[in-house]
Amino acid sequence: MYQNLNSKTSPSSETSHKISLVIGPTEVADVMTGKVVTLSPHHSFNDAANLMNDRYFRHCVVVDNQSKVVGVISDRDILRALARNPNSRSKSLDQIMTPNPITVKRRTPIIDAVSKILAKRINCLPVVEDDGSVCGIVTSTDLLKSYQQVLELVQKQGR
């Protein structure tokens, strides 16, 4: 029904690590979810809905057979499809997913990811390798958690 991709992590530079200890995470790799559950475009609406419900996911990355990102399916996509047509349950993901989503790379600065999410009014960005294969996902929740860490560090330093 779905596949788990192992995280393809690469060590951060020593400088980046020191900076992140002082001011918090600085790159998408510092805050992304690295083990991504993916679906293929041919999976069914029900496959996605059941997976997302069982795992408490709000988003799933849709990939082709080379693990290249071709879409994202969200809980909103599922609700929208049902609202438009109660018979949507028989559709495949390629009919209801958001195709060709905006992506980022693991070394993308967090501020750039935040800017993309805000500008496009989206809630997640698949993280891809140079070859376009998925290696993670960063969500608005991940970014808020990182912001919270920075605020907590600033607050501690102010005491």
Q: Could you say what each language-model-derived stretch is?
A:
Residues 1-159:
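Tandem CBS (Cystathionine beta-synthase) repeat/Bateman regulatory domains
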